[in-house]
Amino acid sequence: MGSMYRASKTLKSSRQALSILFNSLNSNRQNPTCIGLYQAYGFSSDSRQSSKEPTIDLTKFPSEKIRNFSIIAHIDHGKSTLADRLMELTGTIKKGHGQPQYLDKLQVERERGITVKAQTATMFYENKVEDQEASGYLLNLIDTPGHVDFSYEVSRSLSACQGALLVVDAAQGVQAQTVANFYLAFEANLTIVPVINKIDQPTADPERVKAQLKSMFDLDTEDVLLVSAKTGLGLEHVLPAVIERIPPPPGISESPLRMLLFDSFFNEYKGVICYVSVVDGMLSKGDKVSFAASGQSYEVLDVGIMHPELTSTGMLLTGQVGYIVTGMRTTKEARIGDTIYRTKTTVEPLPGFKPVRHMVFSGVYPADGSDFEALGHAMEKLTCNDASVSVAKETSTALGMGFRCGFLGLLHMDVFHQRLEQEYGTQVISTIPTVPYTFEYSDGSKLQVQNPAALPSNPKYRVTASWEPTVIATIILPSEYVGAVINLCSDRRGQQLEYTFIDAQRVFLKYQLPLREIVVDFYDELKSITSGYASFDYEDAEYQASDLVKLDILLNGQAVDALATIVHKQKAYRVGKELVEKLKNYIERQMFEVMIQAAIGSKIIARDTISAMRKNVLAKCYGGDITRKKKLLEKQKEGKKRMKRVGSVDIPHEAFQQILKVS
């Protein structure tokens, strides 16, 4: 009884202690020291639902009090830092929040220092004008990626905006992605507000950059804002300029509901969360909505804004940007660019977007064949957050079951693999990246090939013509490196289209290049020969006729389908020799000899051999007849022949990784 009494007394005192702790936490939720404790016990200090604060009243912001704008720039010109400062200025996040680049939420974004996924934040701002009462505005900011591979992400984000801040580094000036993003915004009829950032740098030259903006884009230099997002210098002029220059969203509040779906992501608990821009009408929680592309109907379970986290508001009005939750379980039902409307109403669908065009294809296989199901689940979840990846199942005789994936570029592919590893713990093997080719055969049929292994080697189907995709590449660089860059482009089978001077120090080059020549190491090579000063961007162009051949890699006479690639005939020998050398360096020695060959059809163009490990079978023969030793050596030789005939060669994961780097 004594022990039971003590246990009961201890339990009672523990309950009292927990009750006091939680009461204290609830009464001090705004206290910074208590917020950490509150979160440690599994409560969210940012939960708008459980907070006693009144919900945000969006009816105070008619469309004329709304501005939707995006920040666009070349990579590393300070987009995300500027977004941080603007959110601090409006009180959306606290100053010194301890998380630089707040909108870069992915681990891969923080590690690489780049923006991969466009993010949205709603800000509330009191605009004070002289001799007038302060007026409240709702500002929707969209931070976009800067790398060429994610230009599709930028174009989607711009569709929800009426204006854009074009940010340019005061030291580096106009770069290739600055040009590309400017024309994306220009084609979308957005109002462009030029911003020169990093004016606090010792090498900053704002006047030179102003002249570049004038010569390249015909922008008025009087309209350029000079700021430093790092120190806050000049930031007080940015939001007033947004309000004055960028028009409010067009739209009719009395019209039937029409919303543009411009992005989506998957949440483990809520399902698919859709980012929408309300073009006409209004949406309330509980409404029934339909998706024009699929025809599916759903009930709106939650609706709100990003402030900067998901904040439920119960409604969205004309011109506003926010999110909706419908209980959807897969993003395949939420097609980007789709029109969402109220069920049982008839509306004119919105224009939407161009379909995504995949530039690079690669096979993705589990490092351990037994992990195929786990890899499938991981890829299904990840593609819910990255709808620009195409996935189809495929089988390889060397690697087993896997997936053929289409990506927007090599960085996109690299980021996808890194996210698979970091977010889902899966180890994968990637095959050589290829681009989609078109082949015509002797019987007149045409075939588009994304996987080299799918190209028939049957002599009956002789290839009579072939075409490869090309791109229009834009390169901006210092004039002293022009010769080296022209040589690089010529080596990559490029055709020069334009050569102009931006100013006395910088040159603008435009080339038509085969896509295959730039997907692997062109950007790295360009940065290397220009000491990192060149910038590069490209856009799709037409297919052009080319002399293409299928290059097979054979191990002991057996073709390995996962190592096959398609190359230009002029480069076949060099690529084959390089592949053979890399495989020799990374395949471990076996008990039998391994012959590595590169072949075009039946013609061997490169060969090397990995010698066998040799066991000393004569170790125990201390003298005796020489015929005994010869007999043992012959027996060993026959065994190695038999082993070579039936043995399999293990190709390590590192070998596949190195082969990816062969241009």
From Swiss-Prot:
It is a peripheral membrane protein. It catalyses: GTP + H2O = GDP + phosphate + H(+). GO terms for cellular component: mitochondrial inner membrane; mitochondrial matrix. It is found in: Mitochondrion inner membrane. Disulfide bonds: none annotated. It comes from Arabidopsis thaliana (Mouse-ear cress). InterPro entries: EF-4, EFG_III/V, EFG_V-like, EFTu-like_2, G_TR_CS, LepA_C_sf, LepA_CTD, LepA_IV. Transmembrane segments: none annotated. Belongs to the TRAFAC class translation factor GTPase superfamily. Classic translation factor GTPase family. LepA subfamily. It comes from the Eukaryota. This protein may be expected to contain an N-terminal transit peptide but none has been predicted. Its EC number is 3.6.5.-. Gene3D superfamilies: 3.30.70.240, Elongation factor 4, C-terminal domain (3.30.70.2570), Elongation Factor G (Translational Gtpase), domain 3 (3.30.70.870), P-loop containing nucleotide triphosphate hydrolases (3.40.50.300), Translation factors (2.40.30.10). The keyword S-adenosyl-L-methionine does not apply. Promotes mitochondrial protein synthesis. May act as a fidelity factor of the translation reaction, by catalyzing a one-codon backward translocation of tRNAs on improperly translocated ribosomes. Binds to mitochondrial ribosomes in a GTP-dependent manner. Pfam families: EFG_C, GTP_EFTU, GTP_EFTU_D2, LepA_C. This is Translation factor GUF1 homolog, mitochondrial. Keywords: GTP-binding, Hydrolase, Membrane, Mitochondrion, Mitochondrion inner membrane, Nucleotide-binding, Protein biosynthesis. One of its GO terms (molecular function) is GTP binding. Coiled coil: none annotated. GTP binds at residues 73-80, 143-147, 197-200. GO terms for biological process: positive regulation of translation; translation. PROSITE patterns: G_TR_1, G_TR_2. Residues 64-250 form the tr-type G domain.
